Swiss-Prot record:
Family annotation (NCBIfam families): GroEL, PRK00013.1, PRK12849.1, PRK12850.1, PRK12851.1
Catalytic activity as recorded in UniProt: ATP + H2O + a folded polypeptide = ADP + phosphate + an unfolded polypeptide
Subunit composition and interactions: Forms a cylinder of 14 subunits composed of two heptameric rings stacked back-to-back. Interacts with the co-chaperonin GroES.
Name of this protein: Chaperonin GroEL 1
Residues covered by region (Disordered): 524-547
Residues holding ATP: 30-33, 51, 87-91, 415, 494
Amino acid sequence: MAAKEIFFHQSAREAILRGVRTLSDAVAVTLGPKGRNVVIEKSFGSPTITKDGVTVAKEIDLENKFENMGAQMVKEVASKTSDKAGDGTTTATVLARAIYEEGLKLVAAGHSPMDLKRGIDKAVEVVVGELKSLSKPTADKKAITQVGTISANGDETIGAIIADAMEKVGKEGVITVEEAKGLETTLDVVEGMQFDRGYVSPYFVTNRERMEAVLEDPYILISEKKVSSMQDMIPLLEQVARSGKPLIIIADDIEGEALATLVVNKIRGVLNVCAVKAPGFGDRRKEMLQDIAVLTGGTVVSEDLGHKFETLTLTDLGRAKRVTVDKDNTTVVDGVGTKAAIEGRIKLIRTQIDSVTSDYDREKLQERLAKLVGGVAVINVGAATETEMKEKKARVEDALHATRAAVEEGIVPGGGVAYLRALPALEKLKPGGEQDFGVAIIRRALQEPLRKIASNAGVEGAVVINKVREGTGAFGYNARTEVYEDLEKAGVIDPTKVERTALQNAASVASLLLTTEAMVAERPKGKAKGGGAGAGMPDYGGDDMDY
């Protein structure tokens, strides 16, 4: 086992601080409407240009192992905030640094780190409560557009497209971001339920120009079983042919004799039919077929339940106004399933979403929910170059997450103002003893986001903070226009969830770092045992170490 190097007490905390500062300095330059870009070298392809805090943070690894520990902990703040709220990563990083720096001064002066942590936790609880009371619901499309615009670094086109998408597919709908072929950024909305399986054979196509099969008012056979023999299917096919309606077959697989017979009947005009493989795999396939059955009012043909093709009647089949099938996707529009059955299915999926622990499973469940409830919107991001495309796509994804957060928990004034408006509530909080100093740490840290926004805009942060504190409500500093005004009316708003998550994550990690008393890392190769700098190795401050 390799020898370890240990830092204790203040030496350990100062090493952490150096790492926190390095990462924070790189991330904080992106904060606010006048924040700058960061260029990140890639081992292959062109460099990435970004103004997204978490993208910058994820790229940072420091050579000094002790400093790197501090940087990695703050990186965790940024990525957790991004995962939960989708935005606010730079704010979270700035807050984490401020809390740790202020706390470190007090620990060095002899205050108890554990009491400071308790004070910080109590202060954060009060501020979160205050943010919730300041919060207003996003009632209209205009507010959603404003949130999207702010998160997309002031790009009004992106804000408007996201608001349109959310209006069309609703709160539960799925909105995906893809790369467009041209320069324009556009929105496509898919009505009804779409799944990623196309026709089994191109002979089923009804529109040669578009290479798609469009079936109006069809019957829909939904089966978990493979369809390989035609003998069992003949009674059902005869019933469908007599009805004069088209038929869609969605099954585990359609092969051999069955596929050949269907194609021949289609070509001869005996039966307008199209065969599609069932979506998904394993248990997820069964659930998705059940979703389609509920939506179309049909029954899933399952061996587990003893169903047989030869006993099926038209009442066992689903119905829809229209089904469109291309080589990659199938879209079912206006299924005839009952409202009660669909709502029951939706309720079941929501319960599963609440109880599932895997992010992947949750994402798949949300996709299924969206297909039953609202539909799917696709934002196609256009740009002139690949570098611009990457940067723009990242901005659209950020803005999309922020608008979802705004719809979920409402909005507060942006530009760091919401944190300042929470300060009076902290004045009343007196936990007593050394915990009061923990409250003071948060009081100071809450001013940092606005200070950094102002400094990135080229003005003195302290002056801006004092001026904003003299006002009330949404009065604040608009860094884009460099005027003091009502930020809500000016469209400078932030999702409450983003502000809350940024503060909670920053305080959680920073207060843990404050209680650090020792750090252990592998000794760099070639470093002398005494702790001084070895040949060609960085000096880790070994002279200050306690053994």
